């Protein structure tokens, strides 16, 4: 009797686990939405119809890193065939980066130059050039400059110059960790001066729903953090 009970309990637990996995796999994450009240980072069920009116546009990411772009008018399910299958994250990441960067380069729509330096770690913030940098949610900000360099005075300010932080970059080091006292915010542009060079850097935080490297790569390709995508691919090999 006890053995039968344990067997039934195990089957029930397996069914619940598989059902939860399938539900998670069907979730898509919003990257961008125009004309409709969907926030970046929001999750939607890909198996259910998404009503879009004329002119409304939504860009979504699947758990495998697939980028799904929908244009209204439409009332279709974004990913009706999403199931509970296991995602090969490394394989999906390699395929995504290869295909998306090649396709977008041909179309001239990659946000960020292809020859920009690739950071040795994906989440280092390159402050030597203008552009967008991506970070996981609640990840510490670490500035990076290729090749290190000499001692340099550093200033950080929001675009409206409402505050200013001063610090020092030591000679021979390529990284400068920022403390929690520097109030950096998501999707805000900051003017950063290192020595005599000034750049404008926009920080974009990836939501927790972007939960694997294939999804992170897809997100970063869409917002323009291309060198970081290449670094992520190198780290996954």
List each language-model region with its residue ranges.
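Flexible, surface-exposed loop/linker segments and immediately adjacent secondary-structure boundaries
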Residues: 25-43, 49, 54, 64-140
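Solvent-exposed serine/threonine-rich low-complexity stretches and specific carbohydrate-binding patches
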Residues: 159-178
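Extended, polar beta-sheet/loop recognition surfaces of beta-rich domains
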Residues: 147, 196-237
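Surface-exposed, short loops/turns at beta-strand junctions within beta-sandwich domains
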Residues: 179-191
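Short edge beta-strand/loop segments characteristic of extracellular beta-sandwich folds
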Residues: 138-148
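Bacterial N-terminal signal peptides
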Residues: 8-17
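Short proline/glycine-enriched turn/loop motifs at strand-loop junctions of beta-rich domains
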Residues: 55, 146-152
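Sec/Tat signal peptide C-region and signal peptidase I cleavage site
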Residues: 19-25
């Amino acid at each position: 009797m006890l053995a039968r009970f344990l067997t039934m309990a195990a089957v029930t637990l397996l069914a619940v686990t598989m059902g939860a996995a399938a539900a998670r796999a069907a979730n898509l994450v919003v990257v961008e939405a125009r004309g409709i009240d969907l926030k970046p980072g929001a999750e939607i069920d890909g198996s259910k119809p998404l009503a879009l009116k004329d002119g409304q546009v939504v860009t979504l990411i699947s758990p495998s890193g697939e980028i799904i772009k929908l244009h209204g008018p439409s009332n279709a399910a974004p990913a009706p065939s999403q199931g509970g299958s296991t995602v090969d994250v490394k394989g999906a990441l390699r395929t995504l980066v290869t295909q998306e960067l090649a396709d977008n380069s041909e179309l001239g729509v990659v946000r960020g130059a292809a020859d920009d330096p690739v950071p040795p770690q994906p989440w280092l913030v390159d402050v030597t050039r203008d552009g967008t940098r991506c970070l996981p949610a609640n990840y510490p900000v670490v500035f990076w400059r290729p090749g290190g360099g000499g001692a340099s005075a550093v200033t950080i300010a929001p675009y409206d110059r409402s505050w200013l932080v001063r610090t020092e970059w030591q000679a021979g080091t390529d990284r400068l960790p920022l403390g929690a006292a520097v109030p950096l915010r998501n999707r805000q542009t900051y003017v950063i001066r290192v020595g005599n060079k000034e750049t404008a850097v926009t920080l974009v935080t990836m939501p927790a729903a972007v939960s694997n490297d294939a999804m992170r790569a897809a997100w970063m390709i869409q917002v323009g953090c291309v060198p970081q995508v290449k670094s992520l691919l190198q780290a996954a090999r």
